[in-house]
Amino acid sequence: VMGDMNDDPMDNSMLTLGAKKYRKEVGKGDFFNPWWETLEDKGVGTLLYRGKWNLFDQIVLSSALLKKKGLKYDHNEVFIREYLFQQDGKYKGSPLRTHGGKLWLNGYSDHLPTIIYLKK
């Protein structure tokens, strides 16, 4: 399951999936949400709203991707590069949006990308 969920990993809408915060808690048929730990424990998010980081852009994994055989989850990260951020002004430190109202800002998105690394 992946997308802009419009909620953080620990919000009620996401908790209905039953996804676990830690890999060791995942049983057969469960989901694992690595972004929960990324936001809550590491303080890293994908969008900044009123000075607070949120992590709406999530990739939730099935237990099959945590097995020892075949393609499996290795790690995740929020893709953070200097050019993705507003460099000055009121919104300094926020992701550099494409536009703000009618003003073209020549940015990328108001959200940072998320990446899941898989290995054989």
For the regions a language model picked out, list residue spans one by one:
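Metal-dependent phosphoester-hydrolase catalytic domains
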Residues: 6-120
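Active-site flanking residues adjacent to catalytic metal/cofactor-binding acidic residues
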Residues: 2-4
